[in-house]
Amino acid sequence: MKQALTPEQIKEQKPYLDWSLSEREYDYISEKLLGRLPNFTETGLFSAMWSEHCSYKKSKPVLRLFPNQNDRVLQGPGEGAGVVDIDDGQAVVFKAESHNHPSTVEPYQGAATGVGGILRDIFSMGARPIASLDSLHFGELDDPKMQMKVAGTVKGIGDYGNCMGIPTVAGETTFDPCYSGNLLVNAMSVGLMDQKDIQKGKAAGIGNAVMYVGAKTGRDGIHGATFASADFSDENATQRSAVQVGDPFMEKLLLEACLELIQNHPDWLVGIQDMGAAGIVSSSAEMASEGDAGMDLDLDLVPQREPNMSAYEIMLSESQERMLLCVNKGHEDDVKKIFDFYGLEAVTIGRITEGRQYVLHHDGQVVCDIPVSSLTDDVLEETSEEQKPARILQAEQEANWQPEVTDAGATLEQLLQQSTIADKSIFFEQYDSMVRTSTVVGPGSDAGVLRVRGTKKGLAMTTDGNGRFVYLNPEVGGKMALAEAAANIVATGALPLAITDCLNYGDPNDPEIFWELHQSVSGMAEACRVFDTPVISGNVSLYNENNGQAIHPTPMVGMVGLIKDLKNLVKMAAQAAGDQVYLLGQTGDDYAGSELQKMLTGDIAGTVADFDLNHVHAMMKTLLSLMEDGKVASAHDLAEGGLGVALAETLFKTDLGMNLKLDLTKNQLFSETAGRFVVTVKKEDAAAFEAALGDDATLIGEVTNSHWLQVRLADGNLNKNVADLEQLWKEAIPCQLKSRD
């Protein structure tokens, strides 16, 4: 690394502007917080900790709209992950994180380290990770370069998760041109624990040890946090030094060592935190702040894998597979023995001090001496201008696009071959979904389901996000994202508990983009309150742009639900001939942002209609009650492609068919009205089912042995062999990928 600048040179040359620190912030730090010019190391620490990625300085005012508590929440936002009570002294722990910028630059390592980072967040809370999920958004598959990025991303996720022995059980993958220059790779992890083992990222107790454990520190990932707080351009998209490199075998050892310490020797440990974004500085400063303490660190003691690392590099490195512990004085050697057994570094690099000062030593010199609060609590929140986008104002003045479907069968065949709808097994078959043998329902269904061993309980989990609807109507799109996640959870027979999120947007300095963020979070927050699903963790990923072209605003909702007794688990596929088929919810002419619109016009446009959240929630509540009473044979929520696609998906992987009569048009068969399900019910349960749901349930036909989907519509018919439809659906993506060769 080049010679560090003096404080005076920093003031004059302003290198901090390239590190996402503004001149206003630099002056505030110098004049108000420190009363002097910060040195090179200190300036680097401020640039990382004051980045949007670490501080949420632009998004905090919006994030306050989210509810984050209810009777089940044991730990909300602010720790490594959220924790929710699932009864019997047990808790589920979950969180999602984005790794968009690194994955765009280096898809394999970016995706792999995204998985590794979120797993560390889970076991830092004291939980054993039991499942991984993802939410992946790519450009179109007809681009050979995008095919390579898709392959790298999927392999990175699969390799890391498989080596860790943690199943990937659910997720979503979409394709749209808006993600061509900036992929979205959102990783979610779910863990299980006894409530007595919950940990905090806290450093307290004067004289207690600060211990560094795990892999050695290198120069990879330096300024990863600030890299994630700026958009891409042709000039900076080559910042591969900001991408971390992962080692899942090291992480597996780290997981086992940490859980052994937490579960067997809780009296040795004060707090524990993952070294994620901004590396040592973030974990150490946040732990000291949480414990209302000071901290004194000797960076010469930090295990390093590269020679001559500066204090700046050591503190800002985002090398993977590292944790920071606060250990009660006198137990340092005890802790070291545990990590020695696993072949891991475990070094005391500092102590907790009186007061709230953050002091770093390197090469015999003090290289940082600043208040802890200046890094964590004194960040200047920023207010952003908001402006309703011109495209939305114009769309509100125009009539919505209406399709003209002439052949419902041919249209269904085409839709099933669209990349976002088509079978994704070519991707998720690279993930081990059954390792640890707790998986009950794996990828390809509405939600993944795992059993809670030693109990009758199950956990359902899903990730959902549709940027197209949010792009056209951010507030309604935000509601739809939450309602879609809830529908996926309820479709399995589970009660939605809480959510995590990844808020993926463009440059917040653009008034239109900040308006999108504000409006969509407002819609999500309203839906969270209606469904009683607080936001317990998550992250914000802004600046998802390439050369000024922003992605569609894409909030991702990760939701977990509880199945009280797995005997009441409901599958997506139709179960038996003779079962009655019901459409739940009312169907409108909702084509704006739909797969049908994109397929037929090559674009999306129009306005997305609002819907009654309270009514949808009440309907789901009734449906869940019927499931718990054993009155539902199968259930599938309606999403991309509407009822037509959902009916086909319900019959795939079965030998069954359906004979249906609908008061819907050929167009409406593919409408994407929110809050609907297709449900099958045994004949003997039909009367009770109809009585409970009333007008929300429309009998549309029955399941047959024919393996044909036969639908009589108000203006035509659809008759298709299910095996033929399934073959088109299964072969669509492999055919696109082969076209590259």
From Swiss-Prot:
Enzyme class: ligase
Keywords: ATP-binding, Cytoplasm, Ligase, Magnesium, Metal-binding, Nucleotide-binding, Purine biosynthesis
Pfam families listed in its UniProt record: AIRS (PF00586), AIRS_C (PF02769), FGAR-AT_linker (PF18072)
Compartments, record wording: Cytoplasm
Active-site residues, Swiss-Prot/TrEMBL: 53, 99 (proton acceptor)
Residues annotated to bind Mg(2+) 2: 121, 274
Entry's EC annotation: 6.3.5.3
Protein name: Phosphoribosylformylglycinamidine synthase subunit PurL
Gene giving rise to this polypeptide: purL
